[in-house]
């Protein structure tokens, strides 16, 4: 068997998420069907991150196996042909060891959350950013974010449906940058809990609006109770950037 690693970008707006589910449209399904159309093989695609409905990706990594060898550049062209007209594209493909696993071999995952902070909405980036009209104090958000760096129990920031065995995660990066009218939050960790990034963003926005004091983020973290954290930020502002191996 030949194992291929592909790098994918997609707009999550019209998808139920990455993972295949009965009765709804997923990114995994679209790609698996495209691979079947040119290879004649039923494959299972394994992704590095299982993004939720509405979440986008710039560098999602996935792997699949084929019984026959195909040139990687031909796979890119074939997949991109057959995924039309969906907002999905493959921009890299390489042959890898059969020991490689897109999910379990990953050592780090990186996300970005985009906020447009101005009095009027972004038409060009509709469903691609979270528009917040109230001015945000980015410095306060940055100060609050430092409480989340490192290894912690992130129970307060996980969803009620999270299936992870442990709430203990290690946040290796949380960086907040303002570029003109856009605020970008970069978060990195070996792995994340379900809704963890979006719940963190929702809580930091409360700090940015001066509804919460900076220290409240530490209180929320220490409480280990989802009910005391802020609202879940909308899915459409979140992007899976890349996975590292």
Curated annotation (Swiss-Prot):
Q: Which Gene3D superfamilies match?
A: Pseudouridine synthase I, catalytic domain, C-terminal subdomain, Pseudouridine synthase I, catalytic domain, N-terminal subdomain
Any one GO MF term held by the record is: RNA binding
Enzyme class comes to: isomerase
Q: Could you tell me what reaction this enzyme catalyses?
A: uridine(38/39/40) in tRNA = pseudouridine(38/39/40) in tRNA
Q: What CDD domains does UniProt report for this protein, alphabetically? A: PseudoU_synth_EcTruA (cd02570)
Per the record, the GO terms for biological process are: tRNA pseudouridine synthesis
- Listed SUPFAM superfamilies: Pseudouridine synthase
Print the keywords alphabetically. Isomerase, tRNA processing
Q: Which residues form the active site?
A: 52
Which of this chain's residues are annotated to bind substrate?
111
Enzyme Commission number(s): 5.4.99.12
Q: Which InterPro entries match?
A: PsdUridine_synth_cat_dom_sf, PsdUridine_synth_TruA, PsdUridine_synth_TruA_a/b_dom, PsdUridine_synth_TruA_C, TruA/RsuA/RluB/E/F_N
**How does it associate, per the subunit comment?**
Homodimer.
Tell me the function of this protein: Formation of pseudouridine at positions 38, 39 and 40 in the anticodon stem and loop of transfer RNAs.
Write out the similarity annotation.
Belongs to the tRNA pseudouridine synthase TruA family.
Name listed for the protein in its UniProt record: tRNA pseudouridine synthase A
User: Which lineage ranks, top first, belong to the organism behind this chain?
Assistant: Bacteria, Pseudomonadati, Pseudomonadota, Alphaproteobacteria, Rickettsiales
């Amino acid at each position: 068997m030949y194992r291929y690693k592909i790098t994918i970008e997609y707009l999550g707006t019209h998808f139920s998420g990455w993972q295949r589910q009965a009765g709804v449209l997923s990114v995994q399904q679209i790609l698996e069907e495209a691979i079947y159309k040119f290879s004649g093989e039923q494959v299972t695609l394994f992704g590095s991150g299982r993004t939720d409905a509405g979440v986008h990706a710039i560098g999602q990594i996935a792997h699949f196996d084929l019984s026959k060898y195909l040139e990687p550049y031909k796979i890119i062209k074939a997949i991109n042909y057959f995924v039309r007209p969906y907002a999905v594209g493959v921009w890299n493909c390489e042959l890898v060891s059969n020991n490689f696993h897109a999910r379990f071999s990953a050592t780090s995952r990186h996300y970005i959350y985009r906020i447009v902070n101005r009095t009027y909405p972004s038409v060009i980036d509709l469903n691609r950013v979270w528009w917040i009209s109230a001015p945000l104090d980015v410095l306060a958000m940055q100060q609050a974010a430092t409480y989340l760096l490192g290894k912690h129990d992130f129970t307060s920031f996980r969803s009620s449906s999270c299936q992870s065995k442990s709430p203990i995660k290690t946040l290796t990066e949380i960086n907040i940058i303002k570029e003109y009218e856009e605020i970008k939050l970069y978060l990195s960790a070996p792995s994340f809990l379900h809704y963890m990034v979006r719940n963190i963003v929702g809580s930091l926005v409360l700090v940015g609006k001066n509804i919460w004091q900076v220290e409240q983020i530490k209180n929320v973290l220490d409480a280990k109770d989802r009910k005391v954290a802020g609202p879940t930020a909308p899915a459409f502002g979140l992007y899976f950037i890349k996975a590292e191996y």
